[in-house]
Amino acid sequence: MFSLLSRALCAASSSPAAPRGRSLLAALLSPSASPLDPCRGPAAPEPPRRRAFHGSPSPLGFRSTPASWSSPEAGAAVGGDDGLEVARLGISPWIVERLAARGITRLFPIQRAVLDPAMQGKDMIGRARTGTGKTLAFGIPIMDRILRHNEKNGSGRNPLAIILAPTRELARQVEKEFKESAPLDSLCVYGGVPISHQMRALNYGVDVVVGTPGRIIDLLRRGVLNLSEIQFVVLDEADQMLAVGFDEDVEVIMENLPQNRQSMLFSATMPSWIRKITSKYLKDPIIIDLVGDEDQKLPEGISLYSIASEHYGKPSILGPLIKEHANGGKCIVFTQTKREADRLAYAMGRSYACQALHGDISQNQRERTLSGFRDGRFNILVATDVAARGLDIPNVDLVIHYELPNTSELFVHRSGRTARAGKKGSAILIYTNDQARAVRIIEQDIGCKFTELPKIEVADEASDMFNVVRDNRSRLAGSPRTGGSSFGRGGYGGFGEGRSRGFGDFDGFGSSPNRGGRSRDAGSRYGSGFGDFRRPSNAFGRSSSKQPDGFGFGDFGEGNFSRNGNRRSRSFDDSGSTRYSRRPNGFGTSDFGRSGGFDDSN
């Protein structure tokens, strides 16, 4: 039956006296018809999918929010707090509905302070403590204006708003906020992932672009990002963009933007470069300063503690601190280096569910790690300062500064991962005796006061976070098949003489000589880090190098846990020498008695 109909339609279409037959044929043979239809032949390739163009890039209209809506009395009407009801802002019902679905019905101080000038289209500079919800502060006005513009003119191909962020984590967080708060097409662009996917999304058309300056410059040079219709530009964490070297890229991007736009800049500090770009690219900006001359820049609900510890004893006091102050909730431990984060996460993983986060981890793995931490699949995140800014992880109960931050501002941003959005939290600073002066400087710079915690004795086995090995892998690795005591019973090798400190307590991460079996102390009274192995173990591959490979933090492949030429493995010591200092130093020592190899960047 189908073949007879097909032949009849083909004959009708070929007859010059049958225009109605051609019309019928055209209607039946739609683009969705089978490419094997005998009347059509092979299907033509589909053109690139693009959104409908709006008529012209006309400026977005603005309206003023009634001042009464942002008055203290309005917030006091419901709940008696300083909030502002989202439903009373007069913004798009789409935004109100989506924010309500996320549990956001009221705004915080910086949001209500920014709202009125943003709705009027004025340039502004926003300064506030970390964790106060800056993303919604500039996001609500932008989303509302673009939604109303698209309802009137249709969606265009080129973006109408661009937000610059210093890190990929912050960029992803901002773009996620837009995506969850309004039915707009948004795109996050950053390095470390294939650029082709981002180019395809731009060809399709987007409303909002969020990204790091470096990748945005790359897209501009390739000609796939058109900024000619931009009417909103936001610089988020502008001071951090200066710190990571994006200052020139930011100025190049600002030079390529239309003159008729609204510019908003948000920063915790105001260095000279910030003042330069505000005077050059912002028009009579309004300053929204919720910090002012106050020294305290930390969230209101944060409790600050400090605790003194010897360097080799730091790992052992983490367990008691987490148990007492995190109360089973989320905890972020900040380290100075990527290697240190890897080591600490690996060690803590024997007794706790934890993972590491730093710049050398692939983007896909970073996303999985952050997702798992947010969802509660593990509660301890060991991170470098890559996580100090921009990551909006809810319900972090405790922040531990395993090493002192380089600056007071970095301490603020690290600690600001807890006590966010009006909640309570704690931050603990671990310091050595020779760092006591640096702690006082932080107190003076920030205007805070630490509560000193009593010192925890490292030798207290009940307090050692590593004295219980819950992982079956440790018992398997401690069997003769995998090299004896290199992993076995007590952990990373036995420490023969004296009492092992740090990770090397007899019942902690180091086993006694009689129970360890295959490894001996390298000669120091205290175990250096995870243990020094005089007798080599070749369980995990061999290395032809005469330099000891230690753990290497690869995938336990060739070279890790290896036999080396001088029959001595320095475990986690990263210095260039095979000699050992007698000074205890946590994860390994160099000739100078200091931690070796911890000088990599974040």
Curated annotation (Swiss-Prot):
Keywords for the protein's UniProt record, in alphabetical order: ATP-binding, Helicase, Hydrolase, Nucleotide-binding, RNA-binding
Chain segments carrying region Disordered: 33-76, 503-602
Reaction catalysis annotation: ATP + H2O = ADP + phosphate + H(+)
Domain Helicase C-terminal: 317-462
Biased composition (Low complexity): 33-43
Signal peptide coordinates: none
One GO molecular-function entry: RNA helicase activity
SMART domains, alphabetized: DEXDc (SM00487), HELICc (SM00490)
Annotated residues for binding of ATP: 128-135
Gene3D superfamilies in UniProt: P-loop containing nucleotide triphosphate hydrolases
GO biological process: Group II intron splicing
Motif mapping: Q motif: 84-112
UniProt cross-references to InterPro entries, sorted A to Z: DEAD/DEAH_box_helicase_dom (IPR011545), DEAD_box_RNA_helicase (IPR050079), Helicase_ATP-bd (IPR014001), Helicase_C-like (IPR001650), P-loop_NTPase (IPR027417), RNA_helicase_DEAD_Q_motif (IPR014014)
Locus of motif DEAD box: 236-239
A single Gene Ontology CC term: cytoplasm
PROSITE patterns according to UniProt: HELICASE_ATP_BIND_1, HELICASE_CTER, Q_MOTIF
Residue span, Helicase ATP-binding domain: 115-288
EC number in record: 3.6.4.13
Domain note: The Q motif is unique to and characteristic of the DEAD box family of RNA helicases and controls ATP binding and hydrolysis.
PANTHER family: ATP-DEPENDENT RNA HELICASE RHLE-RELATED, HELICASE ATP-BINDING DOMAIN-CONTAINING PROTEIN
Name of this protein: DEAD-box ATP-dependent RNA helicase 53
